[in-house]
Amino acid sequence: MKRRFSIPWDDLSPLLDGMSAIDSPRLEIRSLEDADDFLESYGYDWRITEDREELEKLRTESIDFIERDLLFDEPQLVIPREVRTEQDIRKLLLWSSDMTYPERQRWAWVIFRVIHIFSHSSSYFDEKYGDAIREQILGRFRPHVFSDGDAISLGTGPGSVSLSAFDIRGRKARTSAALKLLHKRDAGGSEIFDWVGVRLVTHDRYDALRVVRYLREHNVVNFMQVQPGRTRNTLIDIDRIEDELVELNELARAGKLPDYMVESELRKRVNQHNYPSPPEKSYNPNSSLAYHSIQFTCMQRIHVRDRDNMIVSAFFDRLPVRGNPMVKALRAYADRLEPNSDVRFLFPFELQILDQHSYELSRSGLASHHVYKERQRQRVKERLLGESIRRAAE
């Protein structure tokens, strides 16, 4: 049968209107040759054993994630055995395009989209230099954080701020990164800014403002390195604080308020304020309206000594067949490598500032991390499995 002229709009939408490929309903792969070319443009060569092994690892990881994290409360949904056991990724691509068998098409496409996300759910720099990254970021704060038994403070002396908690988060799990990316409209590894997270908890909201001021005045963070569009403040009303500070200073100038009481009066007022409304365009739609914090993303210039080249040279030195021509050629190549080359790069970290009340809310109720992750999971289920869930309910 002669095929009529058509345009593969589903494949072109990500290029023409910015729609995420995750939201495309299907692929347009017509043959194994097409699948080979598609994978090659993706960065994988099916003829290379290492590439096939990496794809198989991603496939297995993706199926485990779907079944463990998305389907545990959907017993009516089961990945068809034919799709679940197929190890040839090219066939999954073909099935993702073939509408002749709708159920197979839907599940093959679900699996490949999750494979795509897992291929983005890691950071090369975090995996290779994660310990050094955290140490250098923590190193910016360590000289300013003081602990005396149960008491913690940011700085010492008159400008210090009492803290109830200070911590730096450990490495983000790949499944957590995948879930985060799957709910984003723009799903890509470069969109994860919180591989490293720093949190400071103050006793009241006014001290949260003082923490921001301290970080700036002591260059603990550089405001030039704060990422535009990655700041979210739902903790303190800056405009209202500015107006009230002007009012209090005018009262002091008029002799109606002692100068030494200006800040204490401002503290009292700030702590009585209602929480500000969240921005209309929040970069995290899963954040609860009950969650209040100051958050921003800052870049840290990381400097590490890469010892891999030195290890390569030492390996060749220990080989018992150093006279072999091939080994000699490889050793000559290793000699041209800098044994202790320096690596420098920018790496993001997210800083959160909360008051004690907001911190306690974040550990229970609507603002808790567990509830936040569940909202995220439900959005991902709808995005990937919405049609299958609705069909199963019919």
Language model features: what each stretch is:
Residues 161-163:
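Active-site-proximal betaalpha loop/short-helix elements
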Residues 1-120, 127, 144, 206-394:
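An acidic, glycine-/histidine-flanked metal-binding catalytic module
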Residues 150-158:
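Acidic, Ser/Thr- and Gly/Pro-rich intrinsically disordered linkers and low-complexity segments
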Residues 28-35, 169-177:
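General structural signal for secondary-structure boundaries
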Residues 92-151, 165-174, 180-207:
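Extended, domain-scale alpha-helical bundle/helix-rich regions
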Residues 157-159, 168-172, 187, 285-287, ...:
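Residue-level signal for the start and early helices of compact helical domains
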